[in-house]
Amino acid sequence: MQLTTQALMVQGTTSDAGKSVLVTGLCRVLVRKGIKVAPFKSQNMALNSAVTKDGGEIGRAQAVQAQAACIEPTVHMNPVLLKPNTDVGAQIIVQGKAIADMDAIGYNGYKKVVMGPIMESFGILQDEYQTVIIEGAGSPAEINLRENDVANMGFAEKADVPVIIIADIDRGGVFAHLYGTLALLSESEQARVIGFVINRFRGDIKLLESGLDWLEEKTGKPVLGVLPYLHGLMLEAEDAINVQQVEAADEQLNVVVPVLTRVSNHTDFDPLRMHPQVNLQFVGKGQPIPPTDLIIIPGTKSVRSDLAFLREQGWDKQIERHLRLGGKVMGICGGYQMLGESIADPDGIEGDAGESQGLGYLQTSTILAPEKQLKQTVGTLQLPEQPAVPVRGYEIHAGITSGIQTNAPVQLQDGPDGQLGIDNQVFGTYLHGIFEQTEACNAILSWAGLEATQTPDFDLIREQGIDRVADTLEEYMKLDKLWPEWADKFAK
C-alpha cells in the first residue's frame, strides 16, 4: 500500500480495542506539529451523541476527537449514526439528520445508499484539511457483516486509504487477534494494512519482544507501537458506561443513576464520576435503589418502554419513598419527561402508539413528535437557595413538553427550560452536558445537599486526558513510519 499523508484509518480487532482513543491522540499529535487534521468515522452505532453548531447529530467520540484536533465538530465527521431503539432496530441519522427507523436487515440493504453521503462527507473533509484520521467500527473481520460494509475495509477500499490495526493486550490473546484478523481479510485488504498497534500493555516490554518478532515475521507487517495501560484516563466512553471513579474525599454526596434499557448520553455523568466529593452508583436491572441523596433519571432513546421498565424494577416506589424521606430527584431529557404527568406517542415514534402515565412529580405533559429538537444552547440556572449561574449544553429530544413555566429553573437564550416540583425536591431539564460547567455542577450538588462543593474543571480534565494520550503516542509509537513525508516533524 502506497503511504499517503492525506488519510489514515484505524481499525481494531474488537470493539473497545482503543480505536477512538488512538484517533483522538493522533489528532492532537498532528495539531501539535502544525498539521491541519480532522477526525472521521463513516458509521457509528452509539446512544451517546453530540450536537453540532448547525443542529446536526454525530457520535460523541467524534466531537471529542474534533476537540483534540482543535476544530469545531461537523456532521461530516460522522455521516452515519445508528441509534438503537430496539434489540433489532435503530434510528438512522445521515449527515446529522434522522431519516428513518430500520431493522438490521433493512439497513443492510440500505448501506449501498448511504455510501454516497459517506463519500461526500469524506471528500469535504479531505478538501478542507491536510489529513483525515479515520476510525473504523468493531472489527473488519466480522464475516457476517462484510457484505456492503461501509465502516471498515469496505470504506478503506472505496476511499483507497492505508490502515493500521489496534488490539487490546489486556484482554489476552493479542497475537491471535492480530494474526487472525489479518488472515480473514482479502489479499487487497491485507495489502492495505501497514502495521499493528498493541494497546494497554502492562509490564516489561522485554517479555513481549519474542512475540512481536514472531508477529512481524509471520505477517510481514511492522508493530508500530506498544502503548502502555493509561490508568485513570478520563475520556468519554463511546458506548459502555464507564464506572471508574476518582479517589473520594471525606465529605461525599451519594448519587444513584438507574440504568434504563436504552439509556442515552450517559456521558452526562462523567463529571460526577470524576468529582472527588461524589459517590456515583449505577443501578441495573434487578437491583434496588440504595439509600442516597440524589437520584438522577437519565435520558433514553425509548422513553415510554423505559418508563415501563423502571416500574417493573420497582424503582418508581423506591423513588417515592426516597422523596418522602427528603431526598432529591433530577431527570435529564427522557428522565425529565418521565417525571411529568403523561407521555403521549400518537404517531408511534418510539414503538406502539399510545399514552403512558408519568411519575407525576412535575406538572408537565409530553407529546412525542417526528421532528427532533437538536441544538446547542446557553443560559442561566437558578435552583432554590442557590445563586443564578451560567449554564451551557445541548438538547436532543423528539418530545415537546408543556406545563407551568413560572418556576422553570433554567432560562435559555430561546426561552425557559425544565421545572421544579414536590417542595423543590424534583428538578427536570432537557439540557445534556449540564454538569460540565463548574458553577452549574456546584449549584446542583449544593441543592442536593453537598456543602462546600469543590467541583473540578471538567474541560481542563478532558484536555489533560487528550494531551496525556498524545504524549504517550509521541513516546511509544513510530509516528514517522505512518507519515514518511512528515518524518522530520516526528524526529525524537
From Swiss-Prot:
Residue span(s) of domain GATase cobBQ-type: 252-440
Specify one Pfam family. Answer: GATase_3
> Which PROSITE patterns does the record associate with it?
GATASE_COBBQ
CDD domains the record matches? CobQ_N, GATase1_CobQ
Q: What does the record give as the active site?
A: 333, 432
| Lineage top rank: taxon | Bacteria
For this UniProt entry, the molecular function terms from Gene Ontology, in alphabetical order, are:
ABC-type vitamin B12 transporter activity; catalytic activity
Q: Which UniProt keywords apply?
A: Cobalamin biosynthesis, Glutamine amidotransferase
Give the pathway: Cofactor biosynthesis; adenosylcobalamin biosynthesis
- Biological processes, Gene Ontology terms: cobalamin biosynthetic process
What exactly does this protein do?
Answer: Catalyzes amidations at positions B, D, E, and G on adenosylcobyrinic A,C-diamide. NH(2) groups are provided by glutamine, and one molecule of ATP is hydrogenolyzed for each amidation.
Would you identify the family this protein belongs to, as annotated?
Answer: Belongs to the CobB/CobQ family. CobQ subfamily.
Name recorded for this polypeptide: Cobyric acid synthase
What organism is recorded for this protein?
A: Photobacterium profundum (strain SS9)
This chain is encoded by the gene named: cobQ
